[in-house]
Amino acid sequence: MSFDITENFDPRQYVLDKRFENVGRIFAFASGKGGVGKSSLSTAAALSLAKQGKKTGLLDFDFYGASDHLFLGAELSFPEENAGILPLEAAFGLKFMSIAAFTGEQGVPMRGPDVTNAILELLAVTIWGDLDYLIIDMPPGIGDEVLDLIRYIRKSEILIISTPSVVSVRVVKRLLDVFVNLNMKVAGVVENMVSDEAGKRSLSEAELSAADSVPFLGRIPVCPDLEKAIGKPEELLKTSFVKKTGQIISGII
């Protein structure tokens, strides 16, 4: 019986495994649709961990809507090269990498294989070094970019973001089904943008998690001070939004 040892073998996987071998845990923030606050939550979690003195990285992989740098107030510049590329440094020693470091504020007109190759290239050349935690801001939905990320970053733990909207929750249920069928580790579900009025529509914890094996991590109320704190890390840390996000992330680390 003969077989081809190159079948289904991608040498880049070995490189990626080496890149992340000194990263303690990797949390990938995902959502079934846009507009649920995934990027703000990703940034808040990373800032909270960095402020605690944890060695933390933040990877903004929302190819078509990168915005984490806006929350951080980080100036984008082409990363320094040293046998790879080094992440930018943001507030509190947070290591930060974004597709926007290469594209600026321009759109990225890529699709299919081009997106996959760009993802693999950026993952393979970025040198994170020793990290306690890496937070990944994933693209919304379940397209090629998301599937590629969870395929190649095997240590990922998925954290799913929803809102009280019935539409959002139903999309999250479908997303959960996909991740469970792919045998991905799902850290839990967070419900964002909860208000008194929205709370009347908010589904039960069992409905949000959709499966006994997927914990419901908590609800984050609407924060009226969040908008004016964008771009000011010190001010962001004072908001109820970041404080609540920090409590949730601390509960799973």
Where are these regions (language model features)?
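Conserved beta-strand scaffold positions in the cores of enzyme catalytic domains, especially
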Residues: 25-26, 58, 94-96, 216-219
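Phosphate-binding loop that captures ATP/GTP phosphates
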Residues: 55-105, 109, 116, 120
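Conserved catalytic-core segment of NTP-binding enzymes
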Residues: 125, 133-228
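Walker A/P-loop phosphate-binding motif and the immediately C-terminal alpha-helix
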Residues: 25-62
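Extreme N-terminal, non-catalytic leader segments
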Residues: 1-32
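Cytosolic-facing regulatory segments adjacent to core modules
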Residues: 102-143
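C-terminal boundary of histidine-terminating zinc-finger modules
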Residues: 230-242
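Helical mechanochemical/support elements of P-loop NTPase systems and associated helical scaffolds
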Residues: 19-22, 41, 45, 63-64, ...
